[in-house]
Amino acid sequence: MAGYPPNPGSGYPYGGAGGYGAPPPPYGSSPAPSAPPYGAKPPKEGKTSSSSAPYYGGGGGYGAPPSTQPYGSGGGYGAPPSSQPYGAPYGAPPPSSAPYGAPGGYGSPFASLVPSAFPPGTDPNVVACFQAADRDGSGMIDDKELQSALSGYSQSFSLRTVHLLMYLFTNTNVRKIGPKEFTSVFYSLQNWRSIFERFDRDRSGKIDATELRDALLSLGYSVSPTVLDLLVSKFDKTGGKNKAIEYDNFIECCLTVKGLTEKFKEKDTAFSGSATFTYEAFMLTVLPFLIA
């Protein structure tokens, strides 16, 4: 992305375990014979359970075109793990670790953020950008400071998108981030910008439903046509008239899909594409994405 310093030579970009450009297969791209049929009887009262895979498509590697099979003819969502971590999307942290500086699981969304430091080899421009935003020298920057810092690199985001970024990279709603989280946000945005430009094939500054589907597949998320239509309608600034989304809304869309999928997989311990939540866990999972 124009104006961004290059990623560190150590390959720091957030979660790039397989090397940039080579993410694991999309979550749900292999058969899942153990998954119950769509529309299965819901669990007992007091629990909320997602249905098993209604209609999820398979996908290829990073940047690959959709499969020659009809969309959705691949394996069910929630397929058994391959040699890669179960469904780990491009840009995800190792499955054994919580987001930077955050406790794991479904703890309080207002838990304190653990102080952090810049990872070794962080680009000096990233350090300078953070320090310029950290006006009080506290070692933390808030939502408006992050918004201002990103705008210096031609990244104009709404506060809602900034709040989602902060939540996804800290797993808290304290709306402050430290050096390590800022570095992760910075390089993840750089990578997502590259993906957006890769799939904006007509260079319109927008991506349509087909381009969004391919972009999400490259990130490791295989969503059904119904979900895809909902995403486009939600994030299209014209209310669905253009049936296309711009870059800033693309980021918000990716953050929403990424966050909800990762929260779901924390409960899908049987790799079945189905999970059971208590009422409180369900509310704590969904509400941060609604009230960001």
From Swiss-Prot:
Induction line: Up-regulated in leaves of mycorrhizal plants upon arbuscular mycorrhizal (AM) symbioses with G.intraradices.
Domain of life: Eukaryota
Pfam families: EF-hand_5 (PF13202), EF-hand_7 (PF13499)
Protein name: Calcium-binding protein CBP
Residue numbers binding Ca(2+) 1: D134, D136, S138, M140, E145
Function (record text): Potential calcium sensor.
Record keyword Metal-binding present: yes
UniProt gene name: CBP
PROSITE patterns cross-referenced by the UniProt entry: EF_HAND_1, EF_HAND_2
Naturally occurring in which organism (per UniProt): Oryza sativa subsp. japonica
Residue ranges, annotated region (Disordered): 1-80
